Amino acid sequence: MRKTSEIIKTVDTISVEANGIEFEVDTQGEGERLVLCLHGWPEHSITWRFQMPYLANLGYRVWAPNLRGYGNTHVPKGMKHYQLEILMEDVAALIKASDAKEVTILAHDWGALIAWHFAMRYPNAINRLVICNVPHPAPFLKAMTKGFEQLFRAWYVLFFQLPW
């Protein structure tokens, strides 16, 4: 798979070892203030191509990793490697590897679900959380268990859990 930096010349693509695997990370900007951009499903770090230069121009160092199993990031075999706990550990390890003094997580879709849970578990690990497209887990769970309307709307989430 081509690196984002081969397509967008203002982005650098680096390899970051975190939580025992190699992450492909698109990066732009410098400094101790990090914006960690977590993409959705079925997306890729290139999702953030328009936000990265804007944030870098504001003085942030921007990291947009391809999450575990996406792009050129390592693809561990077996569903146990994709549990929410492991994905939250990935976020913690990426933050640690960045050595940033201030961290903002910007997340969309599947990345937002991971970010919500990470922020609830480790509130002191980040300074800001920006979520696109995903409600807080508490009202979402309430809507899912209240009746069939939301469950019907989110049928595809369950569909993708089937072991083909």
Q: Predicted regions: what is each one?
A:
Residues 2-12, 21-23, 63, 70-106, ...:
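Flexible "cap/lid" subdomain of the alpha/beta-hydrolase fold that forms the substrate-access gate
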Residues 27-74:
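Conserved HGGG/HGGXW glycine-rich cap/lid loop of the alpha/beta-hydrolase fold
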